[in-house]
């Protein structure tokens, strides 16, 4: 069985540990700078192999003004709270039918989760297809404002 002592074990205790003159391994200049220094110069090949997308622009960021922000409300929430909305006079009774404007509640879209137990006229800027069909099935009207 061969027991070969490794080079670093042999050099322990020596002044320079294989680095030649002690001045040679002093400071960051020995390794070409600190951190990612020289990524576009003398460490360019390292960057190409290990971090190829470091330089340049990638992707696209949509301008925030073009993104439409929806604040939706479900039919189940409207149905559960209709008595409270009538008491607070947010929803009103006109010609025997309840009329509710969801923009007064701070919402701008009505979604179709749940169902309506009473006929309600709901006014909103946007409706989902399922919400329109469920409102009309209950005898109400989906009015786009």
From Swiss-Prot:
* A Pfam cross-reference name: Ribosomal_L27A
Give the UniProt entry's GO cellular component terms. Answer: cytosolic large ribosomal subunit
Q: Where is the composition biased (Basic residues)?
A: 1-13, 22-33
The membrane spanning regions, by residue number, are: none
Q: Annotated Gene Ontology MF terms?
A: rRNA binding; structural constituent of ribosome
**Which GO biological process categories is it annotated with?**
translation
Q: Where is this region: Disordered?
A: 1-41
Which keywords appear in this protein's UniProt record, sorted alphabetically? Ribonucleoprotein, Ribosomal protein, RNA-binding, rRNA-binding
Lineage: superkingdom: Archaea
Alphabetized InterPro entries for the sequence: Rbsml_uL15_N, Ribosomal_uL15, Ribosomal_uL15/eL18, Ribosomal_uL15/eL18_sf, Ribosomal_uL15_CS
The annotated subunit structure for this chain is:
Part of the 50S ribosomal subunit.
Q: Which family does it belong to?
A: Belongs to the universal ribosomal protein uL15 family.
> What is the name of the protein in this document?
Large ribosomal subunit protein uL15
Name the gene: rpl15
């Amino acid at each position: 069985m061969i027991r070969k002592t490794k080079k670093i074990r042999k050099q322990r205790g020596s002044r320079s540990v294989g680095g030649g003159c002690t001045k040679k391994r002093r400071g960051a200049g020995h390794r070409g700078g600190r951190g990612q220094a020289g990524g576009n110069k003398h460490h360019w090949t390292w960057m190409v192999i290990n971090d190829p997308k470091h330089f340049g622009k990638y992707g696209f960021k949509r301008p925030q003004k073009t993104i439409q922000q929806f604040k939706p409300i479900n039919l189940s929430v409207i149905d559960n709270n209709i008595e409270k909305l009538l008491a607070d006079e947010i929803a009103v009774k006109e010609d025997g039918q309840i009329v509710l404007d969801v923009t007064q509640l701070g919402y701008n879209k009505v979604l179709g989760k749940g169902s309506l137990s009473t006929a309600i006229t709901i006014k909103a800027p946007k409706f989902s297809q399922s919400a329109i069909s469920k409102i009309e099935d209950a005898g109400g009207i989906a009015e786009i404002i």
